[in-house]
C-alpha cells in the first residue's frame, strides 16, 4: 500500500503541499486531479522517493522509499518529461533499464512494442509526441513495477489510444495486484480509469473518495470542494471549470 500521512512540502517561502494524507491500496488505481501548479507532481515525487517531505511521512508497505534503493526497484515514476534519452532507441533504453530493475521483462517489452507498433531501433527523438509517450509506457510496464506513479499519463495520446491504455492499466493492476497513482488535470480521464479520486487544490486534498461515490453524489462532492475553497478569490471560476470536466450524463442525473 502507498501511504501519505500529513505531508507538507515547501520550496523557500512557498508551501506546495500542506498536510496531505491519502492511501492507495493493493490492486487499486488512485486518480489525483488538480490544475497545473497545485502540487500533483511534487506529491508523486515524494511518494516515489525522489523528494523528501518537510514534515509528515511517505511510506510503501510501511517502509520509507526515500534513499531506499531496494524499494525504488519496485516502483516506477513516469513524469510528464521523457522516461528515456532522446538519442537512444527503445532497444538501447531496454539495456539501460534492465540493468537496474531486477523484474525487467523482455517478454513484456517485446509484446508492448508490437502492440503499440513502434520501431524499437529508431532514435526516440524522431518519434512524435504521442509515440514518445507510448515509449515511456513501454519502458514503465516492462520493469514490472509493483507501484506505479504516472504524471499526466495520457498527454499527447488520441482518444482511441487513451481508451486502450486505460484497459491496459486496469488489466495490469488487477492481474499483478499492483498499486497505481495517476495524476491529471482532466477529471474525465481519471473518472473513466480510477477506483478512487483525490482532488488537490491549493496544496490541500479537497476531496478524497471512491469514483462510485463521486458519480452518485456529485452535488455532495461539489459541496465539499466548494467548502474547502471558500477562502479563495477564484472559487467561482474553478468550480465552473470542474463542472466542465464532468460527463453530461452525470449532469442530467443530478436532477
Q: Model-predicted segments: where are they?
A:
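Conserved ABC transporter NBD signature motif
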Residues: 56-71
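Helix-to-loop junction immediately C-terminal to a conserved catalytic motif
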Residues: 48
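ABC-family P-loop ATPase nucleotide-binding domains
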Residues: 79-132
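ABC transporter nucleotide-binding domain
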Residues: 166-250
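The feature captures the beta-strand-to-loop junction immediately N-terminal to the Walker
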Residues: 33-35
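Catalytic Walker B motif of ABC-type/P-loop ATPase nucleotide-binding domains
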Residues: 148-152
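Helix N-cap at the start of a conserved alpha-helix in ABC-type nucleotide-binding domains
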Residues: 159-161
Amino acid at each position: 500500500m502507498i501511504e501519505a500521512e500529513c505531508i507538507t512540502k515547501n520550496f523557500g517561502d512557498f508551501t506546495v503541499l500542506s498536510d496531505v494524507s491519502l492511501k492507495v491500496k493493493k490492486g487499486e488505481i488512485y486518480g489525483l486531479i488538480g490544475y497545473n501548479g497545485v502540487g500533483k507532481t511534487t506529491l508523486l515525487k515524494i511518494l516515489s522517493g525522489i523528494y523528501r517531505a518537510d514534515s509528515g511521512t511517505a511510506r510503501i508497505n510501511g517502509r520509507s522509499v526515500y534513499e531506499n534503493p531496494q524499494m525504488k526497484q519496485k516502483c516506477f515514476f513516469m513524469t510528464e518529461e521523457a522516461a528515456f534519452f532522446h538519442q537512444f532507441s527503445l532497444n538501447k533504453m531496454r539495456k539501460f533499464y534492465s540493468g537496474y530493475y531486477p523484474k525487467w521483462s523482455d517478454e513484456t517489452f517485446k509484446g508492448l512494442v508490437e502492440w503499440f507498433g513502434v520501431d524499437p531501433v529508431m532514435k526516440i527523438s524522431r518519434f512524435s509526441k504521442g509515440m514518445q509517450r507510448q515509449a515511456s509506457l513501454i519502458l514503465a510496464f516492462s520493469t514490472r513495477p509493483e507501484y506505479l506513479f504516472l504524471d499526466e499519463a495520457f498527454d499527447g495520446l488520441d482518444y482511441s489510444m487513451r481508451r486502450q491504455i486505460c484497459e491496459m492499466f486496469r488489466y495490469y493492476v488487477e492481474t499483478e495486484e499492483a498499486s497505481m497513482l495517476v495524476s491529471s488535470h482532466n477529471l474525465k480521464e481519471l473518472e473513466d480509469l480510477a477506483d478512487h479520486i483525490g482532488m488537490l487544490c491549493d496544496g490541500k486534498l479537497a476531496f478524497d473518495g471512491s469514483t462510485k461515490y463521486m458519480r452518485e453524489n456529485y452535488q455532495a462532492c461539489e459541496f465539499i470542494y466548494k467548502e474547502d475553497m471558500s477562502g479563495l478569490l477564484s472559487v467561482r471560476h474553478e468550480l465552473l471549470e470542474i463542472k466542465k470536466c464532468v460527463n453530461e450524463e452525470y449532469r442530467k442525473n443530478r436532477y
